[in-house]
Amino acid sequence: MLAQLFEQLFQSIDSTLITNIFIWAVIFVFLSAWWCDKKNIHSKFREYAPTLMGALGILGTFIGIIIGLLNFNTESIDTSIPVLLGGLKTAFITSIVGMFFAILFNGMDAFFFANKRSALAENNPESVTPEHIYHELKEQNQTLTKLVSGINGDSEGSLIAQIKLLRTEISDSSQAQLANHTHFSNKLWEQLEQFADLMAKGATEQIIDALRQVIIDFNENLTEQFGENFKALDASVKKLVEWQGNYKTQIEQMSEQYQQSVESLVETKTAVAGIWEECKEIPLAMSELREVLQVNQHQISELSRHLETFVAIRDKATTVLPEIQNKMAEVGELLKSGAANVSASLEQTSQQILLNADSMRVALDEGTEGFRQSVTQTQQAFASMAHDVSNSSETLTSTLGETITEMKQSGEEFLKSLESHSKELHRNMEQNTTNVIDMFSKTGEKINHQLSSNADNMFDSIQTSFDKAGAGLTSQVRESIEKFALSINEQLHAFEQATEREMNREMQSLGNALLSISKGFVGNYEKLIKDYQIVMGQLQALISANKHRG
């Protein structure tokens, strides 16, 4: 029963599969045994591994033979021979692999791991016996005996003998080295002394020769250079003296020109004061005009009083007609004389205003011309000053040029401002005067026309006409005079402020320019004096040094 079961099992198994299984089994056993041998573990398995691999090889051999024999059929030899050969192939391969790995493992164990196991066994015996202790003590005794004989022995190879020899050699070597060092030091000192003598001698001679040549060249160059330098210095000192004289002259000229500028500014101030005095006469003329207007107002009041009388007379006209006619004649004469007086007063007032305007225009023209002349003189003085100073220094020329340009521009601006203010004042005065004259003329003509046209019906409209004429004349004259006075006062105030502002600005700019010029002169003079002192100090030092050498 079991035999048939095994036969069926082996007949169904492929020989190649059995071969691979046994080969992998042998390889696994080999690697496991090698790992245990390397780590020194599982010693029993390590010892049994070669036998196990051989047994697996033999087992594979018999299984291969059985597979070949069981599948061999005598009736069909052709088909049975390949199966038989496959079983034999499995038998031989498994046996060869098993024996090969067993032999390989035994060889590796003998060559690589046996010595290691022996050393470990000696170092770590499983049990220590008295024999081991005796053996160790005996070895230690032998070692100590050899050590003592090596230290205290009489032979030359002992340690004490070697130390004695070494000490003798060290003493001899130190004495020889000391002798050599002494000899070398003496010889080196002699060579250094010889070298120092040679160096001192050669260096002294070369230094003396070099100094002699340098002194000769220095004396020659000093004679040549200082002759020319003294000549140039003499000429420079002469030019400096001449420049100082010219500078003094220019300073005096600048002082004179500055004085002329101050005088011209004083004259300008006087002219402006004259203009101011002339302008002060305008309120006086206005006061006279006020008196004339008061006279006219008085005449108008007289006319009103006469008109009131005429009203009273008109009430009595029915009874006293002849008296009315006589009174009318008297009133007509009075009206004619009043109109004539008003016309004469208006003409006189207009003439006075024209005269005052002409005198004011003349005064303004004269003041403007005087101020223009003074500014022109100032410009000419500063122009000549700039021309003189430009010959002495380029820096001074540029400074004065800028100053003169600024003063010229400011002077021109002041002249333009003064001329514009004067023209505007003159134009306003002429316009106001013309307006007043026209207004007075028109008013007078209107009054005369009204008087002449209303003479026939004066009993009806003379009171109304004279009231309107008086009120219109009074208001217009008052408004015109007030406007004229305000305009004159504003223009005079503006003219005064502009003049004062321009004068202050011009004087300030002039003072700043003169101050900068003076500072420039002082700085240049101080710099020149310092340079002169430096040159003289250097020259004196060179002369004293030359004297000491001589």
Swiss-Prot record:
Coiled-coil segments on the chain, per record: none
Membrane topology according to the record: Multi-pass membrane protein
Cellular component terms per the entry's GO annotation: plasma membrane
Chief place of localization: membrane
GO biological process, one term: defense response to virus
Keyword annotations from UniProtKB, A to Z: Antiviral defense, Cell inner membrane, Cell membrane, Membrane, Transmembrane, Transmembrane helix
Key word Transmembrane present: yes
Keyword Secreted: no
Location(s), subcellular: Cell inner membrane
InterPro entries: MotA_ExbB_proton_chnl, ZorA-like_t2
Similarity comment: family membership: Belongs to the MotA family.
Function: Component of antiviral defense system Zorya type II, composed of ZorA, ZorB and ZorE. Expression of Zorya type II in E.coli (strain MG1655) confers resistance to phages SECphi7 and T7. While most T7 infected Zorya-containing cells undergo abortive infection, a minority produce viable phage progeny. These eventually accumulate to a high multiplicity of infection, leading to culture collapse by 170 minutes after initial infection. ZorA and ZorB probably assemble in the cell inner membrane and exert their effect there.
Matches recorded under NCBIfam families: 2_anti-phage_ZorA2
Record protein name field: Zorya protein ZorA
Origin organism lineage: Bacteria, Pseudomonadati, Pseudomonadota, Gammaproteobacteria, Enterobacterales
